[in-house]
């Protein structure tokens, strides 16, 4: 692990010890643990009513509002075909990159072939790595966490890594997280103990990848607030509804 990563984790620890995950009004992160805990294991591919299963999901600001609309249209028009795409996505016997590629391809094909004609305006499947990371995190938060392009980009910059092209970023992000950030988090027992005490009091799920992602998001916010030349495509907190779709294709 690099000194920069250790410094980021240490900085996040100091913030955690001062505010906790839910005590800073400018950076409230506890909601992510609640959201995962409330919805872990969903969408359930064995649910009798898969449309209802999809419609019950709460994505909050972890995905784009248009993606919430899109997945509900999938559920409305082709729930059984949509179910099949998740069966493949959640098959851990298949490599993650292959699952991502197929999920994106199948969703686009399903949308273009059977759903798009229901709308007069131009639409798309709105299926990208950010949405996929949401589904994977709910499936297994001990292995996966949420993806944001700016967090991935800042991590690549720190490690001197070249960013992958769209469609290959999520796997690369998880690799960097597992190789560099998670070990730094796991070695900081003071940080782990503080977070575990807070989430245990609420009965929330444990997730080291989510801690690592939150530490990186803490750093990304710092960079955003201190580098006026940096253009951020998603603004969290009070600006959580300010979306820019170039992030999805960069």
Question: Across the structure, where does each feature detected by a protein language model lie?
Answer:
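Compositionally biased, charged N-terminal/linker segments
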Residues: 222-250
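An N-terminal alpha-helical hairpin/helix-loop-helix interaction module that forms a charged
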Residues: 1-125, 140-231
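Short hydrophobic alpha-helical segments that form membrane-spanning helices or hydrophobic packing faces
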Residues: 131-137
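Short, solvent-exposed loop/turn segments at secondary-structure junctions
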Residues: 137-143, 239-241
């Amino acid at each position: 692990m690099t000194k920069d990563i250790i410094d980021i984790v240490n900085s996040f620890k100091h913030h955690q010890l001062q505010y906790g995950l839910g005590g800073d009004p400018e950076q409230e992160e506890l909601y992510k643990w609640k959201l995962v805990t409330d919805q872990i294991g969903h969408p359930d591919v064995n649910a009798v009513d898969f449309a209802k299963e999809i419609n019950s999901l709460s994505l909050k600001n972890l995905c784009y509002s248009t993606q919430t609309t899109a997945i509900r249209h999938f559920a409305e028009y082709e729930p059984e075909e949509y179910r099949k795409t998740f069966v493949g996505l959640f098959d851990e016997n298949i490599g993650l990159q292959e699952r991502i590629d197929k999920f994106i391809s199948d969703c686009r094909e399903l949308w273009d072939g059977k759903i798009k004609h229901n709308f007069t305006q131009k639409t798309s499947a709105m299926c990208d790595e950010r949405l996929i990371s949401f589904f994977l995190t709910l499936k297994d938060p001990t292995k996966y966490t949420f993806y944001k392009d700016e967090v991935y980009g800042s991590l690549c910059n720190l490690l001197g890594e070249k960013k992958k092209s769209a469609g290959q970023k999520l796997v690369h992000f998880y690799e960097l997280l597992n190789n560099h950030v998670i070990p730094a988090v796991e070695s900081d027992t003071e940080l782990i103990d503080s977070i575990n005490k807070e989430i245990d009091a609420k009965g929330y799920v444990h997730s080291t990848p989510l801690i690592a992602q939150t530490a990186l998001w803490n750093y990304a916010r710092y960079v955003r607030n201190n580098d006026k030349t940096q253009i951020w495509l998603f603004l969290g907190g009070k600006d959580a509804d300010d979306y820019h779709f170039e992030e999805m294709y960069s």
